[in-house]
């Protein structure tokens, strides 16, 4: 009977750990750059669930990590929601009318993009 109880408790512990690990989300904090053959410029900075945009119609956005969306706001635009993706230092989103990849400063993807477009 003790063995069965121990096995059940161990199983519950493992399930709890797996569930908690899957809910853990990677921090998005940092500076994101738009890097292409024409430009290498700071696009926006994320701190927590908020971001400030350097250039463009929108001034800022709020991040909803559960839905993978952002809510763009600003004086020159009507608020709108856009889906985003984030993987390996690349934040892909439409903040200017066209979806672009933005690179987290000092990430491997950032350094690779700098090399690809001849900035390093």
Residue ranges and their predicted role:
Residues 1-20:
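Sec-dependent bacterial lipoprotein signal peptides
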Residues 4, 23-25, 88:
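N-terminal cationic leader/targeting segments used for protein routing and processing
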Residues 19-33, 45-47:
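N-terminal helix-cap/turn-to-beta initiation motif at the start of protein domains
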Residues 35-79:
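N-terminal glycine/threonine-rich, aromatic-flanked beta-hairpin/loop signature
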Residues 60-67, 96-120:
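Edge beta-strand at a domain terminus
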Residues 76-108:
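Structured, soluble extracytoplasmic/luminal domains of envelope-associated proteins
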